[in-house]
Amino acid sequence: GSLYLDDLKKLVDKTVCLIAFPHASNIIGQVNPVKAICSLAKEAGAFTCVDGVSYAPHGIPQINDFSPDIYLFSSYKTFGPHLGVMYVSDSLATELESQCHYFNQEFPNKRFTPAGPDHAQVAALGGIYDYYDSLSNHHLNSELSSSSCFDKLNNLISNQEKKLLKPLLDFLKTKKDIRLLGSYEIED
């Protein structure tokens, strides 16, 4: 459901080690204030783990902007292969115990892959980039090359979803026998 930053502030102190939360609710679709939660956690000395599985199909997660310690999503929900994707910040990765063979411990990209990568699945991840690059070429007349391009694509996707969602919400408002979890209003 909905996460409220003011409620979280009351719970976070120096004893909190990890704040794990969804980027977006899988139930009501509300996008949570990821950047603010990550900032609050850092102030308290806690790590963050953001579950992006419900958000990633609706936009490109701006991991550099949010600064989470861990960000996870399923690539099959973003036009990719059936594969889990995990980002781990360099600062956290150096603190975690290596899960690989001893001779790979010094390689950040190998530390958490004990059996080695599934090369076919990893190669198929390139299709996600191709999809977004095609969107960028078609709608923005530019190649996928910068964070501003990602921002424009996020806006493009979001605006299309809002356009499709508004008539549905307007219709549901007229139905007295339906209870909507979440808001009838489309938030930015």
Identify what each model region corresponds to.
Residues 1-188:
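Pyridoxal 5′-phosphate
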